[in-house]
Amino acid sequence: MSNILHRVGTLDEVASKAFRVRKTCNKMLLKRGFNIDEEDIDMTTEAFISRFGEKPSRETLTILAENKEDVSDRIFVFFPEEDKVGVKTIKMFTSRMQQENVKKAILVVKINLTPAMKSVIREMSTSDGNSFRLEYFKDSELLVDITEHTLVPEHIVLTPQEKKTLLGRYRLKQNQLPKIQLSDPVARYFGLIQKQVVKIIRVSETAGRYVTYRICV
């Protein structure tokens, strides 16, 4: 036990960041409705070192999860090793996705992607006949779980049926709903796509509990 504590005390900054980022990724997938082992959500630094080592390779941090409601809906989380991710790396990931019949992936990169690489990912995600959906986050965006911040209200993504029921109940057209941008940090956290609706629950000392809805644009 003392050896473990000693190693934790000397855990370098890179490994510490990897621990925090991977833990946030698991929490994010859980809140998106994917099955995540409880041990991954509650993982301690000691458990992380035991599983991945003191200087983990980013490749070993890869996550593969399936949706609680639809086991065919699976998602990868990849952690590229290189600082500047290129087309070769993206193609390596999409090749693995094809082999394992996985349509969604999140890339967790060390630094921001170049505009050219962002364009490549957009094209790969929207090309005719290509059903991949690729998202990306920087390490620095996942050091903490933004949904756990006291100023961020609870967000719940509505199913298509729940959205239909909402619009029918209030006799609304979807363009009459308040909007949330695709680029909004919380929208990105939940992996929202255009026209999805999110329910936002706020708690106020003066107004009590109140609910609003926003549509992703």
Which positions does each model-derived feature cover?
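Helix-rich terminal scaffold detector
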Residues: 1-103, 115, 119-131, 140-145, ...
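Short, structured beta-strand/loop micro-motifs enriched in basic residues and often containing a Trp
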Residues: 173-184
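Short, surface-exposed secondary-structure boundary micro-motifs
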Residues: 202-203
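Short, compositionally biased
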Residues: 208-217
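Long beta-strand-rich cores associated with HINT superfamily self-processing modules
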Residues: 153-158, 162, 166, 206-209
